[in-house]
Amino acid sequence: MSRKQLALFEPVLLVQALTDAVKKLSPRAQWRNPVMFVVWAGSVLTTLLTLAMVTGQIAGSALFTGIISLWLWFTVLFANFAEALAEGRSKAQANSLKGVKKTAFARRLRAPRHDAQADNVPAAELRKGDIVLVKAGDIIPCDGEVIEGGASVDESAITGESAPVIRESGGDFASVTGGTRILSDWLVIACSVNPGETFLDRMIAMVEGAQRRKTPNEIALTILLIALTIVFLLATATLWPFSAWGGNAVSVTVLVALLVCLIPTTIGGLLSAIGVAGMSRMLGANVIATSGRAVEAAGDVDVLLLDKTGTITLGNRQASDFIPARGVDERTLADAAQLASLADETPEGRSIVILAKQRFNLRERDVQSLHATFVPFTAQSRMSGINIDNRMIRKGSVDAIRRHVESNGGHFPADVEQNVENVARLGATPLVVVEGAHVLGVIALKDIVKGGIKERFAQLRKMGIKTVMITGDNRLTAAAIAAEAGVDDFLAEATPEAKLALIRQYQAEGRLVAMTGDGTNDAPALAQADVAVAMNSGTQAAKEAGNMVDLDSNPTKLIEVVHIGKQMLMTRGSLTTFSIANDVAKYFAIIPAAFAATYPQLNALNVMGLHSPNSAILSAVIFNALIIIFLIPLALKGVSYKPLSASAMLRRNLWIYGLGGLVVPFIGIKVIDVLLTLLGLA
């Protein structure tokens, strides 16, 4: 991705985040975060108490209460700053996308032909179903499907990838995105959305995320934090009558400070920032998620359905051999295979034409002069071919050709069955060629497993994630490649219906499934999967069915998506552990300071040897505020991610963030206490 990556603390973003943090001090903004709303209410109360003490309306130390009030406001401000900084980074990314949107005119055709009469209209007036003509140098004015023509398109404004891509009518590469530029030739496009509903508009709305909906895990954690806050609020409220009964009532300022230090303000202040940052990191990987729910689901995924071609293998299968049936000349097989592939623009189809040319000097025929009917490949038929001069030539998968032969009254030869098995056992893909009901032989297609993919699958297995390879190959070929790549299972001879059934089967077992897809035939499975990453180069139907879009159109990205999702969940869990653990140190700081005058026995809890009750309370409140600032980089970048099993990950995080949450506050509060004493503020 060539789009500029944002530094963690860009000066411009910092200034904007500080401004937004102050704006978020309003009660309406604070009410959305119940934990921080309690801190905000405490800040208001102590501010009023300070003013009353300064004006002599009530007795008490205005300096002590004022400092407590100031640091409570800082606590709220720092939490606001964390959220504003995360949102600011997302908005900066959105602004870079807004730069792609340009006010332009479009040639709206009166008929769906490139030579039809056209009207120049503003792009904003285009509606779903309108037909437009776009020529070289033009910006595509809307999302849509190419219905005529083919062109080279610069999609760098959307994907960050400088290499142009081909978009043409028919097949899985007919989808175009508004805001991209035509470099050559022309396209006739049927608009698929209304203004404001384009892919670019949805990207911007998602990235800005001003009204981001909370995910299920976030809601559950928020409920837990609210419950803890209510418990500590009730506990704190009961302490005043106890201390008053003992003859030395604790001040309201101290009770507010105690409450703020007891409730989980650290995770409460950072929770929203973690969610926003997770979606921002996903965009940094050039993946657009439609919601935080999709990112969170990626972290919980335990089954990955991976297409073999392009994900597990390099995806450039090349014809390597012609293996004729008994009684058939190899040249005859090569000639028929080349004829069946003349209109096949896939890498496999082109390689068959080239191999026939190299082996037998069979030159490409002029497609137009043949007056032939080409039969395109479909996911249902799983074969393609040509009808020419009363000859019906087909090439395709073994089972598809077998059905074709038997339906035409023929017999599938045993020697071809053996050749198919031999090719498959070597990890190559066998394509069978047939003319009428007469099987001519087998074409071997070789593919190469990507380097390092086996190690990545081993890491996923450690994390408890099952990998399943999806391929249209027969079972023998699929088994050979699956063994070489190290996947846990495979689905051979896959059809759209088989993929959908497999996803439902895993979901019925309580598993969460992730998959990628780019074609219209993938749409049902994408809609069913828990995490569905559609390729940006794919059809509009696929992009609408998925809950994520990969701008790089790289199927391997699914593994990275899962890593980002797990990192977000780990970050949230780690900081929650740290937040709850560091409350323990605050108990040892504040409780002896607040109640030692009433109950001298509590002095035994002052294990840190803090200078005075006032310095102990101030130190705890200041530490409580500062720890939010220190944890902001961790919340935005995410905790260090290592592919481990769930139990190993839990142990690791308990040691680092649980023990760290216990130790760090003891050190921090003691250091702050010493500094306050040296400055004469306690």
From Swiss-Prot:
Cellular component terms per the entry's GO annotation: plasma membrane; potassium ion-transporting ATPase complex; potassium:proton antiporter complex
Bilayer disposition of the protein: Multi-pass membrane protein
GO molecular function terms attached to this record: ATP binding; ATP hydrolysis activity; magnesium ion binding; P-type potassium transmembrane transporter activity
Keyword line: ATP-binding, Cell inner membrane, Cell membrane, Ion transport, Magnesium, Membrane, Metal-binding, Nucleotide-binding, Phosphoprotein, Potassium, Potassium transport, Translocase, Transmembrane, Transmembrane helix, Transport
Keyword Transmembrane: yes
Transmembrane segments annotated in the record for this chain: 34-54, 58-78, 219-239, 254-274, 588-608, 616-636, 662-682
Catalytic function, reaction form: K(+)(out) + ATP + H2O = K(+)(in) + ADP + phosphate + H(+)
Database matches in InterPro entries: ATPase_P-typ_cyto_dom_N, ATPase_P-typ_P_site, ATPase_P-typ_TM_dom_sf, ATPase_P-typ_transduc_dom_A_sf, HAD-like_sf, HAD_sf, P-type_ATPase_bsu_IA, P_typ_ATPase
Quaternary structure (record): The system is composed of three essential subunits: KdpA, KdpB and KdpC.
Family: Belongs to the cation transport ATPase (P-type) (TC 3.A.3) family. Type IA subfamily.
Matches recorded under PANTHER family: POTASSIUM-TRANSPORTING ATPASE ATP-BINDING SUBUNIT
Record-given protein name: Potassium-transporting ATPase ATP-binding subunit
Naturally occurring in which organism (per UniProt): Salmonella typhimurium (strain LT2 / SGSC1412 / ATCC 700720)
Source taxonomy: Bacteria, Pseudomonadati, Pseudomonadota, Gammaproteobacteria, Enterobacterales
